[in-house]
Each structure stands twice: as structure tokens, then as C-alpha cells.
Amino acid sequence: MPTRIVPALACAGLALICGSRAKADPDFGYVYTADIEEPDETELTLWATHRAGKGEGHYDAQDYRIEVERGLTDRFQVSGYANFAGHHVRGLSGEFEPVHRDLAFQGLSAEFKYQLRSPEKRRLGIALYAEPGWSRISKVTGEHATEYEFELKAIVQKNFDNDRLVWAANLTLEPEWEREHEEIGPGTKSRETEKELGVELSTGLSYRVAPRFWLGAEARYHSVYPDWTHGLRRENYAVSAGPSLHYDGGEWAVTATFLPQLFGGPGRAGSSLELDDHEKTELRVKISHEF
């Protein structure tokens, strides 16, 4: 187990014994549901994601997010994020330079989520989501770069078997503008801005196997379109899927999802995986507390 994510898992173990009352619906590691925080309720969430494996050399990265979520009305909630990152990169070719950084402030983002229809009473739940963000460290390479993004998400959710089985799916569009701080000559730095569009389809299914425990699976398709304002040309894609576990203790909740990449393209010689913009495996743990 990656040592850098052990503290998050230790906190998760502590959270397992702190709860009091269970909620109706589960949380997923990557897939969003159409549920909305109740008015005047606040939730604090720690996200910890470990990404590893590029097919050569050594690559491991950690993404940490501290989220404060607040319900404003019966249908609208807002969140603020402080993002941190760690990268350990060596022996990779292409755009990857050696990076050894345990933890650094990465950037800020905000979330706005509006529920069009609740998933209660066996209806199809629908929600819309927007997340503007700013980053000072590239998520993939770990190098310093100024990035602006605007994530847009359509969310659907359907509950079955008296809410014991929950299905959710997301369509995500994420335009991004990046300016790398690259030195191209003595005292001269590149100021070129690159545009990129990420397109993602994700889905999750979770079943309540005990009063507080949910067991399920998640799947994700993610693709990248460079210079998207001049036409859509897919540069690469990756498909990942894996198990998801959620524990709801009332005020405390813990979610863990493991997503290995199944296949992608274009793959490198002798591999069916896309390892330029994606990794071999991802492990995410989320710890939430309501107050």
C-alpha cells in the first residue's frame, strides 16, 4: 500500500467507529449523484487520490482536496476546495522531467450544483454541476504551470429496490487553458497557452449490503482533445473500472474506490494502456463529516 496515502486510510478507520445514523444513498469515489446538501447544513470532506504507473521509470502522484460544502436551498448547494499535490517522477521520457515533491499547494476551485429533480419516490434524479478552477501545478507532469479550467457536468441518478440499489451516471466536459513556465533560452520563458478539452463518461452502481455499508463498482471513460476550439480531434483515451466501498456512519462517512486502467489508446509498444495523460491505477479515499 502506498505509504503516502496511509494517513488518510488511518483517518478512515477512525471514522468507521464514530457514526450514529445512516443516510439513504451512498457516495462514490468518482461518480457524482443528484443528491443535494440540505439547506443550512455543511459538510467537510478530505479527498486523497493516489495515481501510479506510466509503463517506464517511476511515477506516483498524490492529489489532496479539502472541500467545504454548504446547502443553500432545497435544490442548490455550493462548495469551495483547497487543492494540494505531490509528485515523484523519474526515468520517464517525453514531456516528463524529474520531480520530487511530497506536498505543495496546487490551487483553488469552487463548485455549484443545482438539482433539477430529486431521485426520491423512484424518480430519475437530475442535477447540473459547474466547477471553475485555478491551478499552479500540472496534475500530470507535476511541473509548475498556470492552468484554468471550467468543469461542466450533467448528473442522473436512479434508485431501485426501496433505495437499496443506486445507479448514477455523469457526462463531463472540462475545457482547460494551460500556460507552462518553460525556459526556452537564457532568461527567456515560454508564455504559450495550450487549450485542451477533457470529455468523460462515468457510471456507478452501489448496493446496500448492510445498514451502513454499500458495495459497488464504478467505470470511467476519459478522453483528451487538444486545441479544441479549432476542431475536435481525439488525442487519447482511457477506460478504467473497479470496486467501490462506502460506509455511512451518520455524521461521518468514508468512501474508497480503486480504478485500474483496463485499456486505452494510443497504447505504447506491447501495451494496451494509454500512459501519457493517464496512469495504470488510481486509488481514492474520501472522508466526510457533517455539521
List the predicted regions and their residue ranges.
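Low-complexity, intrinsically disordered short peptide segments enriched in small/polar/basic residues
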Residues: 2-3, 14, 69
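Cleavable N-terminal signal peptides
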Residues: 11-12, 22
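Transmembrane beta-barrel domains of Gram-negative outer membranes and organellar outer membranes
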Residues: 23-290
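Bacterial N-terminal signal peptides that target proteins for export
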Residues: 1-9
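Local alpha-helix boundary/kink/capping signal
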Residues: 13-16, 249
